Amino acid sequence: MTDSRYIGRFAPSPSGELHFGSLIAALGSYLQARANQGIWRVRIEDIDPPREVPGAADTILRQLDHYGLHWDGDVLWQSQRHEAYREALAWLGEQGLSYYCTCTRARIHAVGGIYDGHCRDLGLGAENAALRLRQTRPVLQFTDRLHGTLIANEPLAREDFIIHRRDGLFAYNLAVVVDDHFQGITEIVRGADLIEPTVRQISLYQHFGWQAPDYLHLPLALNADGNKLSKQNHAPALPEGDPRPEIVRALRFLNQDIAQDWQALSMDDLLSQAVANWQPAKIEHSQMAPAEL
């Protein structure tokens, strides 16, 4: 990248409204960008229509605005990026780095859950088939800005993973890498639930010959049952009233210093102080933590 300026991002999928766990990821990435005098992008990852909730994308953008998390530039919509994904797939194909696969989930489960390369040299066509990366650059470990060196599950890291689904949808790992490169993202701050796919994404960067960003994975907030706060687990949406208490709650979760008189501060002043006091090193190094602290 010719521009050395910090560029971060928050990239939610419109499968429901933002909840407290989402706020942690959004706030962490926002504070890291602002503390580095950088740019903070927002991308809507709307490439999986069966999982999307009508109106959720607009609600997410309104929630971010309500919570004072104002992004730079235009929102990028993955649903408008299909041509870029097709070009990336075509390039991989031209380099001999992809192949079609008709293996079912049942077959992969029967061989232990990790794809074994069964279709790699069969020369199959596109009909009723997924497209897989021909893995030539497995990434067995990477450095996380919070957790240090993280070691991958080696069979998973060496797997020829799907880059275009059998149902015609673009795979998450392909789309996220193409878009992060397009947007010039220099560091990705997100939840620890995305640690596992990181080695696949770095591997894709290497196959394309692109510089991978840095990574910082934040701890996941757990509900009272010990499960991750998520839309699938029916985590409640962020409150619509005064956003400051939830911002303070998220800052506490991230183990950050908070002004004693925060209730006397405006939303903008509270966030400005949070930027000035931001210390990622103080975040708990565990990958999960209770939401109520």
Swiss-Prot record:
Keywords: Aminoacyl-tRNA synthetase, ATP-binding, Ligase, Metal-binding, Nucleotide-binding, Zinc. Zn(2+) binds at residues 101, 103, 115, 119. GO terms for biological process: glutamyl-tRNA aminoacylation; tRNA modification. It is an enzyme of class 6 (ligase). Binds 1 zinc ion per subunit. One of its GO terms (cellular component) is cytosol. Its EC number is 6.1.1.-. InterPro entries: Glu-Q_tRNA(Asp)_Synthase, Glu/Gln-tRNA-synth, Glu/Gln-tRNA-synth_Ib_cat-dom, GluQ/Sye, Rossmann-like_a/b/a_fold. A motif ('HIGH' region) lies at residues 12-22. The keyword Metal-binding applies. L-glutamate binds at residues 9-13, 45, 172, 190. GO terms for molecular function: ATP binding; glutamate-tRNA ligase activity; zinc ion binding. A motif ('KMSKS' region) lies at residues 228-232. ATP binds at residue 231. Its cofactor is Zn(2+). Pfam families: tRNA-synt_1c (PF00749). Catalyzes the tRNA-independent activation of glutamate in presence of ATP and the subsequent transfer of glutamate onto a tRNA(Asp). Glutamate is transferred on the 2-amino-5-(4,5-dihydroxy-2-cyclopenten-1-yl) moiety of the queuosine in the wobble position of the QUC anticodon. HAMAP family: Glu_Q_tRNA_synth. NCBIfam families: PRK05710.1-1, PRK05710.1-3, queuosine_YadB. Belongs to the class-I aminoacyl-tRNA synthetase family. GluQ subfamily. This is Glutamyl-Q tRNA(Asp) synthetase. It comes from Klebsiella pneumoniae (strain 342). The gene is gluQ.
